[in-house]
Each structure stands twice: as C-alpha cells, then as structure tokens.
A protein has these predicted regions:
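Bacterial signal peptide processing site
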Residues: 20-22
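C-terminal motif of bacterial Sec signal peptides marking the signal peptidase cleavage site
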Residues: 15-18
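Active-site-adjacent loop/helix surface patches within enzyme catalytic domains
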Residues: 51-81, 87-89, 94-213
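Sec-dependent signal peptide recognition
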Residues: 2-9
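Acidic/histidine-rich, metal-coordinating catalytic segments
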Residues: 214-232
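Post-signal peptide N-terminal segment of mature Sec-exported envelope proteins
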Residues: 27-49
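Short, low-complexity, polybasic intrinsically disordered segments
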Residues: 230-248
C-alpha cells in the first residue's frame, strides 16, 4: 500500500511541474547585476570631428607662443560647425565698464562674455598669451548681425563661416564712446590704451596658423574687423595697426 502511495505522490508532483508557468524564475543567486557606471571626466574625442575641420591639437602651433585652454561651456556658447571657416574676424575686449580698476583681468573679461552670451574662439592677452575659448570645430558667437559685400550667404550669418579672435585692449574715445562718456574715458590710464607689441606678434602667428590650416587667404578680404561686418561695432578700432597684424 505504501508503495502505491509513493508512486501516486510522484505522479502528482510531475503533473504540477508540467502545468506550471512556461518561464521558470531564475534563482536570485544566479541574477547578474550590472555595476553602476563609474563617472569619468568628459573627454572630447577629436577623431569624431568633421575631417574638413582640422583639430587644433593635431596641428603644431608656433612653439614660442603660449597656448592655453580657457574654455567656455561648449553647449551654452557654441554649436557644431557645419561649414569650413572662410574668414577670421578681429575684435577687442576688456572689462573697463564694470571693472575700471582692473580692466584686463581675464576672469572679469570672461564673465563679461558669459553675461552677454557671446564667445570668441581665441583671446590674446597683453603679454601675448593666447587662450582658446571655443574649439575651431565649433561655431562661436562673436559676429552677431551684419553683412559682408552684399552677399546673402553671410548676412547675419558670419558666425558660421568665421573664426573670432579677441584682443584684450581699450580703443580710442571714438571707439569707446558707445560704452562711456568722455569724462570717464579721460580717467583711463593712457598706458592701457591700444595694443602691445606682444599682442601683434601673437596675433600675426595665430593668423598665419589659422589661414594655413583652413586654407583662408592671408589678406584683408578674409581677415576683417568686427566694425567692417557690423556698423554698430567699433572694434578693433582706430588704434589697431592692420599692417602689423598682417605682416609677412
């Protein structure tokens, strides 16, 4: 009798196993849990950039001049470049309005860019140090609205086709009158006005480097001032010597 009961028990157990769910739950001990991803520093993979835009790090720069990255947040102050640059645009900048006692402090200048939502690719300090603010493979916001030689392609659209360079400088009163009164201008230390020899040397080297790598003609038709594109602007102004910037 016990033998029949044991056989019956086995049959019932087999029946329940055969009619259960089609998927059997995996034992917890066999579940593989993916580890939390480690947060890594953001790295720009330059190999993914458009091939027609030469990554700066892949091209030797003029060794006797300093080159430092002092980048603005890419996502907020630039966008991906779709067209190769055809022009280089020259500007001047300072923090003279908000910080008249320290107008060339680079942090103050950078704060001004952020305040007004503008960005250059490069900025050149008084001692000739060149800082990269926005990589060349991205469009910086430096040109604004304007026109060039009645060409609709560039109307209010020069950012897409240019590289912007800022020089830390204060122009003539005519250049600065849109920012301050003559009385305020007269209080500025005259040694702070205009451009330095080191800036001209660094600018000349940078322009040659950019024009060579991007196949931009090294002439005044393609290296232009902000004031030439936008009548609202005055930079690089009366104190800027174009012959020194484009010295061969």
């Amino acid at each position: 009798m016990k033998k029949y009961i044991l056989i019956l028990f086995v049959l019932i157990a087999m029946l329940f196993n055969g009619c259960g769910a089609t998927e059997v739950a995996t034992p917890i001990s066999m579940i593989m849990i993916a580890p939390s991803p480690t947060i890594e520093p953001v790295t720009i993979i330059e190999e993914t950039l458009p091939m027609e835009i030469a990554p700066r790090s892949n091209v030797p720069f003029v060794s006797e001049y300093a080159m430092e990255d002092y980048l603005l947040p890419f996502e907020d102050y630039s966008r991906t470049r779709k067209y190769a640059p055809e022009f280089v645009m020259i500007h001047f900048c300072s923090a003279i309005v908000n910080h008249p006692d320290d107008p060339y402090n680079l942090q103050y200048v950078r704060d001004t860019f952020i305040q007004y939502n503008v960005s250059p690719h490069y900025i050149i300090e008084r001692d000739g140090t060149i800082h990269c603010y926005i990589p060349e493979n991205r469009v910086a916001w430096h040109a604004g609205k304007g026109a060039w030689q009645d060409n609709e392609k560039y109307k209010n659209n020069m950012n897409n086709y240019s590289i912007g360079i800022e020089l830390v400088a204060i122009g003539s009163f005519a250049d600065m009158s849109i920012f301050m009164s003559e009385e305020t201008y007269e209080k500025i230390d005259k040694d702070l006005l205009g451009y330095t020899d080191a800036q001209y040397e660094a600018l000349n080297a940078l322009l040659k480097d950019l024009c060579n790598r991007h196949d931009i003609p090294f002439d005044r038709e393609h290296i232009i001032g902000h004031e030439e594109y936008s009548s609202r602007k005055t930079d690089p102004g009366e104190l800027f010597d174009w012959s020194r910037a484009l010295n061969n």
